[in-house]
Regions:
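Conserved N-terminal segment of class I S-adenosyl-L-methionine
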Residues: 1-82, 90, 116
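Short conserved AdoMet
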Residues: 27, 123, 159
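A conserved beta-strand element that flanks and buttresses the S-adenosyl-L-methionine
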Residues: 88-93, 97
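Short, flexible/disordered intra-domain loops and linkers
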Residues: 98-111, 139-147
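A short glycine-rich, Lys/Arg-flanked "PGG" loop and its adjoining helix->strand segment in the class I
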Residues: 106-127
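Acceptor-substrate binding/catalytic loop of class I
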Residues: 130, 136-156
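Class I S-adenosyl-L-methionine
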Residues: 150-200
Length: 200
């Protein structure tokens, strides 16, 4: 069983707030990939509303979720191009490749590789939702824990992949939803959150 993690709940509440804006529209019978499915359980309530969704989750840790779950490394998955209409990453991309979780191999550019995979796995017209740590003051890696992104780091990763920002929302460290109002820069080793809606 995965230990209780209030950080996962906080990021799930950000997803719920963005979903409530009406910006995240799941097409009928959408094929959905969740990257890092062991903690933030949005699948159960979503499938109660939308039983037509076909959700596949991938995580290093064992996860019992509705839909299909794959225990393993997202970077070794060989999904065909265009396999998914929607990709969801709730507080996951920033951890990939840092070796934080048991048996999680180190890939220095794990987040970059994963974002490139997401761009390939998305079907034309598909969208991806990512919520990640954010600090306008600068990009930073917190040991093996997580990456904190700024606007430059995001642009460097997303622009070459042909992923376009279709929406951006913020939440502060406590999870208070700020909508489209960017938070003030924070000191080093501190962050808020940004949620991105990306399209191809």
């Amino acid at each position: 069983m995965t230990p209780y993690n209030p950080h996962g709940d906080l990021c799930l509440s950000i997803f719920a707030d963005v979903y409530a804006t009406g910006a995240l529209v799941f097409p009928p019978n959408a094929r959905v990939l969740e990257i890092g499915c062991a903690e933030a359980d949005w699948q159960t309530p979503m499938l109660a509303l939308r039983p037509d969704l076909q959700i596949t989750g991938v995580d290093w840790r064992k996860a019992k979720r509705p839909g299909t779950t794959i225990q393993g490394d997202i970077l070794t998955q060989d999904f065909a191009p265009g396999s998914f209409d929607v990709v969801v990453g709730i507080s996951s991309i920033e951890h990939i490749g840092l070796g934080h979780y048991e048996a999680d191999p180190k890939y220095l550019d794990g987040d970059v590789t994963c974002m490139a995979d997401v761009a390939q796995w998305l079907a034309p017209g598909g969208w991806a939702y990512l919520d990640i740590p954010y600090n306008a003051a600068g990009y930073e890696v917190l040991n093996t824990e997580a990456r904190i992104y700024d606007d430059r780091a995001l642009a460097e990763r997303l622009t070459p992949l042909g992923l376009r920002e279709a929406g951006r929302w913020y939440a502060d460290r406590s999870g208070r939803f700020l909508g489209t109002t960017a938070p003030e820069p924070r000191p080093a080793h501190s962050f808020d959150y940004v949620a991105l809606l990306l399209t191809r």
